[in-house]
Amino acid sequence: IDPPMKGDKTSLDYYKAQLQLKVLDVLRDHYGVDVSDAALREAVERHNRLCRAVTAIGDFRKLENPPITGYEYHVIVLVSQVCPHDLILPYLEETLKELQTRQPEPVFPFRARVVVAGSEIDDPEFTKLLEMCGAMVVADRYCFGGFPGREEIEIREGEAAFDAICRHYLHHNQCVRFMDGGKIDQRHQELLRLVREYRADGVIYESMKFCEFWSYEKVLASHVLQQEMGIPCCTIEKEYNLGSVGQLRTRFQAFVESLEIKKLGTEKEGKL
């Protein structure tokens, strides 16, 4: 698929043509998959049901002392992406019910709350390493993460399901391949929203080695967040496999310490 780099109407029409030719037609002609409007509407409903469950689970991270860790949520998100919806949905809804009664630790066990943004992270051990350094991942805005991607698909009145799906993914998509100014600003505002809603102390921007798109985005976005929004940022580059653990641990520990110092300074100023 050749995805467009803008989100306007021309790009949407091109995107729809690409998906029709290279996805729907292939699924129908070569694999016998039902791609009718009725089948797509049923798939959208399953998708929305899964999104509601995953989003509700993730919302627990907004609490001052969440009953779920960032590592646990990372595993849940990955499972929800690779397992058939009809098989995984009962377990997700069961997990949601369990979390509603699970008692958190008596005292918040982490020293800071952070948002992680950047290239794909499909290894939960990365999140575990970060949380072992004292920073709970309260929001995951990276490839394969929970933001964006868990919004429900809205099918408007009189709209074909296929058109709604294409419109949804093009307009909600915040991949850094989108280079127009509106999309860039949208990504910055999304980070600001996550920091506020999930009460994060800072943002960790990571880019996978040789991922040029996130390497550029990381530089610009970290500058905007720090200089214009006053949000502390830590930027790192990592391998696909979790290597250089010692270096990452040192960076994470130093960032957590800086967040603690800033928090203490803010509290001291508030008492004066």
Model regions: which residues?
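Trp/Phe/Arg-rich N-terminal binding region typifying the photolyase-homology
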Residues: I1-D37, C143-F144, G149-K268, L272
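A charged, amphipathic alpha-helical module
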Residues: K16, V23-E152, D180
